[in-house]
Amino acid sequence: MNKAIASKILITLGFLFLYRVLAYIPIPGVDLAAIKAFFDSNSNNALGLFNMFSGNAVSRLSIISLGIMPYITSSIIMELLSATFPNLAKMKKERDGMQKYMQIVRYLTILITLIQAVSVSVGLRSISGGANGAIMIDMQVFMIVSAFSMLTGTMLLMWIGEQITQRGVGNGISLIIFAGIVSGIPSAISGTFNLVNTGVINILMLIGIVLIVLATIFAIIYVELAERRIPISYARKVVMQNQNKRIMNYIPIKLNLSGVIPPIFASALLVFPSTILQQATSNKTLQAIADFLSPQGYAYNILMFLLIIFFAYFYSSIVFNSKDIADNLRRNGGYIPGLRPGEGTSSFLNAVASKLTLWGSLYLALISTVPWILVKAMGVPFYFGGTAVLIVVQVAIDTMKKIEAQIYMSKYKTLSAVGF
């Protein structure tokens, strides 16, 4: 490993460390003891799941309590609008247009953050504490302070994510979510053993949970490394021993084309609304809806299943453009044996991608929901979904591949420099 790659890894770790430091900076004017007591009693619902994705920042009411979710939500909205309006889709493909597009995403993130921050501030009044619940200062002042604090925190996370993507290794936003989930693993393990010691969970249940986790990890690794290789042939003629030879190659198409995006998008759409509804303890109708959409309920997991399939198809169509691949092949003198260059190749690649996306979307949906079904059947008293495991393993594999690619690239540059 050369110095450049080592430097990128250190930069990535440094920014992730900064992210974890921010998780311990609380919003001024709140009763942290009341907040902790509230989250201890609500760890099994949407609040607990939202807290997990934020790296326990919510339970501390940190300035990054909203995490990166507002940015993800704004990205979802913009992607859907891009698919609807051709001018917006065209803007994304241009260099200057992409900058404008990202600026719109940032402005939308600010708007969503402010709306969510005000919602959280109002919800804190229902938490048992002083006259204003967990709020220790004037309500109007607190709403301004909390909105500014959470907006600052979310903007800092956006900046950290962009810096990691540009100067480090891997996708910055995915790594932030990864770090948040991983940071909660020690406390989750400790909490599980406490349940064993108190007799809430027996040894057989513990063994069952471990086996489910290991099986989930194995399935994710197996599928994430699976790909369909489409052989291609180039018409370049290489004169060797008076014979014309063709250069053979292939197009690798992953079984899971959409990567980790569908479960992240689906979680973002389900978790925060459920969290806001959970705080409406005075309204029986909203509380009933919140209970209905609890992560431990069937409705949440059915919606999760369907949303993941939708986003898998939606995002796959964005990241895999069969027409562009077919055009690039034709320009470079390449073709798929037995198929005409251009439209024929594009139709074939599109058909292959559609079949793979079908199985890939089902894999993502099943991995995100089946572990919960198994754990619920065992009678385990806490929520365990495969979404967190899926995100952690996928991001780890993706980051390792990018590091490996950069190592190979540096070796190639070294060999080119010495004349090989």
From Swiss-Prot:
Stored InterPro entries: SecY, SecY/SEC61-alpha, SecY_CS, SecY_dom_sf
BP GO terms, sorted: intracellular protein transmembrane transport; protein targeting; protein transport by the Sec complex
Top-level taxon: Bacteria
Principal subcellular localisation of the protein: membrane
Keyword set includes NADP: no
Record's keyword annotation contains DNA damage: no
Subcellular location: Cell inner membrane
GO CC terms in record: plasma membrane
Bilayer topology: Multi-pass membrane protein
Pfam family, any one: SecY
Family: Belongs to the SecY/SEC61-alpha family.
Protein name: Protein translocase subunit SecY
Organism, scientific name: Helicobacter pylori (strain J99 / ATCC 700824)
Name of the gene: secY
